[in-house]
Amino acid sequence: MQAHNLVYFSSVSENTHRFVQKLGVPAMRIPLHSRIEVSDPYVLVLPTYGGGRTAPDLQAGGYVPKQVIAFLNNEYNRALICGVVAAGNTNFGAEFCYAGDVVARKCGVPYLYRFELMGTEDDVTAVRAGLANLWKEH
């Protein structure tokens, strides 16, 4: 694998994929049905699933896509994560971008940014700046 700054998962909605494309940085996509292994430090970008329940239950689980869980269950992949960026929908209320909270906490890495759906140009600018700062430190 070449050096990649981002690893991301995007469902068939392609919202996260479109956001990552706007960033214009090297990225590797976690596939829907197969496994990948990374060899370089990366920031994970992922959507949040399961939001908007009748009563928010932040302990219920189901926020992190199964493909991301499988990816992070690989100890090599987990060891190289440097930060998390999450997508979500503000309609989810307290669960907005909650997958980022889950992954950052479980992996002990910073939660760098959260954005709605495909993100705005301001989101793209902020994430680019955050990535540049992070990679200076690594």
Swiss-Prot record:
Recorded family membership: Belongs to the NrdI family.
Q: Which residues form a coiled coil?
A: none
**What is the name listed in the Swiss-Prot or TrEMBL entry for this protein?**
Protein NrdI
Tell me the GO BP annotations in alphabetical order.
Answer: protein modification process
The terms under GO molecular function for this entry are: FMN binding
The record's listing under HAMAP family reads: NrdI
Function, in words: Probably involved in ribonucleotide reductase function.
Please report the organism this UniProt entry assigns to the protein: Mycobacterium leprae (strain TN)
Mention any Pfam family matching this sequence: Flavodoxin_NdrI
Q: Highest taxon of the source?
A: Bacteria
